[in-house]
């Protein structure tokens, strides 16, 4: 008996001695395996293989088919209302939500500097759809191409979501992190022919909807570097990529004899990117004059962080960019204005507690949310006090963006956020669905302009 026990102990000791080597071998295998997966994915990306193919526009989603037939609300034949389906993080079952929107081709011949609340409300849904599209490129058989379906119902004949192909799966996000490529962004670019060329001049609308923070892209929010114009380093690379694509599409339309209007939308990081694209196009148009390949630029952003240190960000040149923020949402306060950060264009705040008729508006917003998303809205208007207090405390403790990236600045900021902010609760005010519900029950007269 003792001999067998000694034998077992001897075997156990040998196993324990080998355990570190075994664990090391497993670690090396996992590391090499992961490296192999990333190398394979990188090769696929470079050769255009191994990704979900871009969907074609679905003919079943004819103009207005997601809801009742297009409504002849005015004499303009291109004006109608329809339902658009998008996804929300808190929606039950398949995660889908429905929003009623209006569309009017005449919007894109009007003055770009005049705020258009109907266009803004529709833009809030188009911004949310940028997130919804990701599911198609992750699991093609289980998720419809929400963006293509929505834009087909709005009459767009050409839609590209090509940029999602290698920016939607987990392996893509890990690869972007490994290659330092996390500053990019997935986006949709689309074209709709507006004018007939008879009574109205031929006009094309080019739409861009930029996706917000996704996977490793979230880290670019923390990139406090800036370019020569003072624009946020974590957003500017994606903005330049999209801006170049818009110019290319506009030149194609111009070559075919069409005037060109541009619509830019985005939520959160996508809103910041859309903000910079709009400013870039405004600058290009100011420099090129009539030689610019596009005319009016309409930009509507939602929950966008601040984007620039440029001293002229609020100048008249950028008066066509409208940035809509929920005052209970902490993201639009960052990076802090105390550090000199702004957004290009005009900032507008949704109603907050204490505003005239707020209780009625909030009740209406919650009713719309419940009907659209299928659950109660968990956003709390009282979070405006938390958001502003935390930001004031950070500004008092951390004097600049440069100080933020020091160990002391980073730890101080983290401590203040961890002490005062419930990350789950505060995000409810940031949800695209919360913005959509608010946009559905308000108009511009109830917004609070943010002073320059």
Give the location of each predicted region.
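A conserved cap/lid and substrate-binding interface adjacent to the catalytic center
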Residues: 153-265, 280-298, 314-318, 322, ...
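The feature captures the conserved acid-bearing segment of alpha/beta-hydrolase catalytic domains
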Residues: 291, 296-379
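Gly/Ala-rich beta-loop-alpha elbow adjacent to hydrolase catalytic centers
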Residues: 266-270, 274
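N-terminal Sec-pathway targeting helices
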Residues: 7-25
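Hydrophobic core
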Residues: 24-28, 32
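Short, hydrophobic alpha-helix immediately C-terminal to the catalytic nucleophile
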Residues: 275-279
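Long, charge-rich alpha-helical interaction segments
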Residues: 358, 362-451
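Sec-dependent signal peptide cleavage junction
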Residues: 33-51, 62
């Amino acid at each position: 008996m003792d001999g067998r026990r000694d034998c077992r102990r001897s075997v156990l000791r040998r196993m324990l001695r080998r355990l570190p080597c075994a664990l090391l071998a497993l670690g090396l295998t996992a590391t090499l395996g992961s490296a192999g997966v990333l190398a394979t994915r990188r090769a696929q990306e470079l050769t255009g293989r191994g990704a979900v193919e871009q969907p074609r526009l679905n003919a079943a989603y004819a103009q207005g088919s997601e809801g009742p037939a297009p409504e002849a609300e005015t004499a303009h034949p291109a004006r109608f209302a329809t339902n658009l389906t998008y996804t929300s993080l808190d929606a039950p079952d398949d995660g889908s939500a429905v929003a009623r929107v209006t569309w009017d081709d005449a919007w894109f011949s009007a003055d770009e500097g005049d705020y258009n609340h109907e266009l803004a409300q529709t833009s809030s849904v188009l911004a949310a759809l940028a997130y919804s599209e990701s599911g198609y490129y992750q699991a093609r058989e289980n998720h419809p191409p929400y963006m293509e379906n929505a834009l087909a119902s709005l009459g767009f004949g050409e839609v590209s979501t090509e940029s999602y192909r290698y920016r939607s799966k987990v392996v893509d996000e890990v690869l972007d992190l490994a290659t330092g490529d996390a500053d990019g962004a997935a986006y949709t670019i689309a074209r709709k022919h507006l004018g007939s060329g008879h009574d109205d001049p031929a006009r094309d609308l080019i739409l861009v909807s930029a996706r917000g923070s996704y996977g490793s892209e979230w880290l670019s929010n923390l990139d406090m570097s800036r370019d020569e114009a003072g624009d946020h380093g974590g957003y500017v690379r994606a903005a330049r990529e999209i801006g170049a694509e818009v110019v290319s599409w506009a030149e194609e339309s111009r070559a075919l004899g069409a005037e060109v209007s541009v619509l830019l939308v985005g939520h959160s990081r996508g809103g910041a990117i859309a903000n910079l694209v709009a400013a870039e196009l405004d600058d290009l148009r100011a420099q090129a004059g009539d030689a610019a390949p596009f005319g009016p630029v309409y930009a509507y952003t939602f929950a966008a962080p601040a984007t620039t240190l440029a001293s002229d960000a609020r100048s008249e040149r950028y008066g066509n960019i409208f940035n809509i923020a929920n005052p209970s949402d902490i993201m639009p306060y960052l990076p802090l204005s105390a550090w000199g950060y702004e957004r290009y264009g005009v900032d507008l705040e949704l109603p907050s507690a204490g505003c005239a008729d707020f209780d009625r508006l909030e009740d209406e917003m919650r009713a719309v949310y419940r009907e659209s998303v299928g659950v109660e809205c968990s956003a709390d208007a009282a979070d405006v006090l938390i958001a502003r207090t935390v930001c004031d405390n950070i500004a008092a403790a951390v004097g600049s963006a440069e100080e933020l990236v020091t160990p002391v600045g980073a730890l101080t900021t983290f401590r203040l956020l961890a002490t005062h902010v419930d990350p789950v609760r505060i995000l409810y005010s940031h949800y695209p669905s919360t913005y959509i519900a608010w946009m559905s029950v308000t108009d511009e007269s109830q917004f609070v302009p943010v002073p320059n």
